[in-house]
């Protein structure tokens, strides 16, 4: 599907995934992961096929919820005590050189309620939001079923702002119908000492 916007010349192409229930009826529609991200998850052949499908479905639902501004869904998947760190690249007037000098990155730790309130404002003010995932690295945590740490390179686009950075999501998928995110962090680049924030940094 091709998406275009009357007040912006940006255009997005999304492959669509249909989920069917046991009666063969469509129960859900979402935007597909990029092929590389899907292949990264599928490469864990030592995991049950069902687990890999659940992970893909979760990430597809996650990116689709932001594109469709589904604040209700996003609110439902974050734990009430979730650790949420957001970031924003600030570019002052003037040219940013090839080494990135002249730009600054602001980080904010937020509670779930603060994050959802801010996201609500973003959704209202933006004509569109689109996120794309690449470089998907998934770790199964402990012996508890369904607990995963997911590292992703994220490209974020909206009508007035865009950036590229790295997400870490700690999510409980033991019940696929009600995923629970316990940690969500963002950083612009991997740290030179410890790389991308991961499950063992908490």
Place the predicted regions along the sequence by residue.
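Acidic/histidine-rich, surface-exposed loop or edge segments in extracytoplasmic proteins
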Residues: 42-43, 56, 91-103
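A short, surface-exposed beta-strand/turn
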Residues: 13-27, 163-180
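Surface-exposed, charged secondary-structure patches
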Residues: 1-21, 97-163
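Short, low-complexity N-terminal intrinsically disordered segments enriched in polar/charged residues
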Residues: 24-68, 72, 76
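Short, well-ordered strand-loop elements centered on a beta-strand within folded domains, enriched
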Residues: 23-35, 148-153, 176-189
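Amphipathic, hydrophobic N-terminal targeting peptides for secretion and organelle import
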Residues: 1-31, 186, 191-193, 198-202
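Short, well-ordered alpha-helical segments enriched in acidic and aromatic residues
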Residues: 69-94
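Sec-exported extracytoplasmic/periplasmic mature domains
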Residues: 63-67, 79, 83, 120-128
